[in-house]
């Protein structure tokens, strides 16, 4: 298959991804059964003071204003409490290039197919580094530990191994092998992935040709995973475990204690030769109060973008930790 056909396959995946609509799930639990259309986990949890969220919003506003005065051109932040559902955002609907963030919803779509066709996970696919141009390589400035990635060029690997490498190492070669397979070699794969991606609803369906994403929409994927509302419980746990194993440590993870698990996916993109975008989104498993946090940035310097993400992560964790005491 030529690189042009692979690129076309990627475009199909992106267009399918862009056609998303919302996902609605009813939650009913014995301990709080008076609600039919909202999550009783939220309704029955002790409410946190409104002033706390106002304070967090003010702190984030101040930090973002300072960061954009100091060389970072744009920052967006979205925080959501996973116990009660309250959220705080700064520039939460601004559009960014999704870049490698797209890997997560595509992985979820393929795993959802595997829930009906388990044999897909053992199907072996070629791992071919010659299938991509150098422009798809992750910049050296984005440091992450790739030593554990044992996939070798020219060999074949099960789909499950490629799915894991796509999330743990953000492996572009594994990702494009999956896209090629699902678009060309799996009967009805394009349509099945399309239906799955529609349920995730993370890109504005009013303009499906736009390959853009906001912190608010993208962070919804992690809430859906946390609630096992898209995949079953076992597969939700499996995907989140892969995300916790992710080897990019200079974003959200750098802002929290080393003992705190973080299920994270980062994305990076260089536009017009100089303009850079770096994003990191995920679930921070604070021991008393887990939350989602999604941060997207634009600027001219990788170091400044990484620092911005890690400092916002630290700010939010400190605020959550102080509330939990």
Features from the language model and the residues they span:
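His/Asp/Glu-enriched short active-site or ligand-binding loop at hydrolase and phosphoryl-transfer sites
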Residues: 251-254, 260-264
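Active-site-adjacent helix/loop patches that line small-molecule binding or acyl-intermediate pockets
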Residues: 37-56, 125-238
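Short amphipathic alpha-helical face segments that pack within enzyme cores
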Residues: 104-109, 217-220, 311
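Short, conserved catalytic-motif segment at the N-terminal edge
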Residues: 68-96
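Structured C-terminal helix/loop/strand segments within mature extracytoplasmic catalytic/sensor domains
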Residues: 3-67, 87, 185, 226-249, ...
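Sec/Tat-exported extracytoplasmic proteins
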Residues: 64-71, 108-118, 129-131, 167-173, ...
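Active-site SXXK
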Residues: 85, 97-128, 134-136, 166, ...
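Solvent-exposed coil/turn segments that connect beta secondary-structure elements
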Residues: 80-84, 93-95, 112-113, 130-132, ...
């Amino acid at each position: 298959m030529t690189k042009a056909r692979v690129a076309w396959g990627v475009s199909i995946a992106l267009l399918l991804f862009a056609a998303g609509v919302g996902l609605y799930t009813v939650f009913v639990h014995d301990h709080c059964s008076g609600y039919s259309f909202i999550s009783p986990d939220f309704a029955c949890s002790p409410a946190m003071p409104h002033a706390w969220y106002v304070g967090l919003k003010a702190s984030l506003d101040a930090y973002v204003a300072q960061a954009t005065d100091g060389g970072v051109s744009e920052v967006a932040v979205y925080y959501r409490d996973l116990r009660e559902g309250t959220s705080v955002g700064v520039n939460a609907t601004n559009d960014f290039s999704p870049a490698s963030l797209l890997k997560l919803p595509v992985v979820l779509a393929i795993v959802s197919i595997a829930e009906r066709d388990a044999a897909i996970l053992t199907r072996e696919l070629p791992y071919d580094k010659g299938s991509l141009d150098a422009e798809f390589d992750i910049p050296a400035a984005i440091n992450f530990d790739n030593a554990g990635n044992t996939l070798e060029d020219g060999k074949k690997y099960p789909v499950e191994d490629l799915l894991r490498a796509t999330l743990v190492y953000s492996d572009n070669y594994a990702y494009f092998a999956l896209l090629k397979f699902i678009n060309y070699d799996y009967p009805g794969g394009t349509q099945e992935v399309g239906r799955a991606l529609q349920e995730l609803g993370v890109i504005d369906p009013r303009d499906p040709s736009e390959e853009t994403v906001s912190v608010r929409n993208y962070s919804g994927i992690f809430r859906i995973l946390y609630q096992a509302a898209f995949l079953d419980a076992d597969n939700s746990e499996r995907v989140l475990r892969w995300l916790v194993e992710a080897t990019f440590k200079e974003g959200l993870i750098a802002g929290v204690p080393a003992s705190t698990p973080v299920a994270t996916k980062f994305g990076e993109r260089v536009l017009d030769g100089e303009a850079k975008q770096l994003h990191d989104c995920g679930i921070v498993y604070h021991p008393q109060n887990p939350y989602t946090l999604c941060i997207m940035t634009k600027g001219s310097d990788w170091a400044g973008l990484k620092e911005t993400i890690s400092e916002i992560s630290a700010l939010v964790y400190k605020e959550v930790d102080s509330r939990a005491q």
